[in-house]
């Protein structure tokens, strides 16, 4: 049995001053307060958060359901939302995985390929972003249980 290689954790030479936050369609529709809490936590670290208001969906639901054309159309609308070379923080392993690993393939050999590859290179899942900037949580009392999202393992 071979050993499992742990994921490479993203690091920054210095803490970013600005990030984009891709809120995901599910978070926006069902748990917007969790998205706002994540944004607040990033801002408390002295980082400006930019939330492009035109964002909608990464295309993952359509892509995972076998509808790449629909995924292409939905994801294409997101590509122009992140023009600055800032990290794109995503609070979802599945959405982050779609953007980081599948966007380059989805847009391969199209006019959108370079933008997709650029965006993919800047994707970082929210909890991995906190680790990368050296976030240390305060002790607020009773401990909570945290489940490590297996889908997030490949997007760090």
Predicted regions: what they are:
Residues 1-156:
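Iron-sulfur cluster-binding electron-transfer modules in prokaryotic oxidoreductases
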